[in-house]
Amino acid sequence: MKAVALRREAASAEALAGLVLCYDVRDAGGRIVAAKGARLDAAAAAAVLGAPWEELHALVMEPGDLHEEEAGARLARAVVGEGVEVKGYTGGQWALAATRRGLLTVAREPLTEVNAREGISVFTLFDGQPVEPGEVVARAKVTPLVIAADVVAEVEALARAAGGLVRVR
């Protein structure tokens, strides 16, 4: 990824398309026209051009980069083990929920290895804690807006080798 700062006079829909925004872009009334982290398509680029701004900060995705949502989805799928499912994405985090009543088992060593990777965060309830169906037992998050696919692949391999980082038995 590469960070760029675009001046309004140099901006066009073509120049904006594909960029990832570093912050919300608002119209004159204060309404968000394009949210932080959005990867601009033609329609979003046109909306951004219609908003009042002088300089726009964004990220250019390069080959081998993943957007935070795609990377987070992959992370979440790798983290879940037996008795846990990916529930949904909200607030930049993927919720992981129990599919049955039981005790939460956390693979602590692999979890520590995963969390040692810059830009990756997986946080859980306590190992051995009783949980109910539908209860969120962990959350997975990719903190940068764009991350190297290699980092995500390493984490996937660690989590899968452990049979998932969180399980309900």
Label for each model-derived stretch:
Residues R74-R169:
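Short, glycine/charged-enriched hinge/interface segments at domain edges or termini
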Residues L66-E69, R74:
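Feature captures the catalytic cores and cofactor-binding loops of soluble hydro-lyases/lyases
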Residues E14-D24, A38-W53:
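N-terminal glycine-rich anion-binding loops that anchor highly charged ligand groups
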Residues M1-A17, A159-R169:
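Helix-rich terminal scaffold detector
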Residues L59:
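Anionic-ligand-binding alpha/beta catalytic cores of soluble enzymes and soluble regulatory domains
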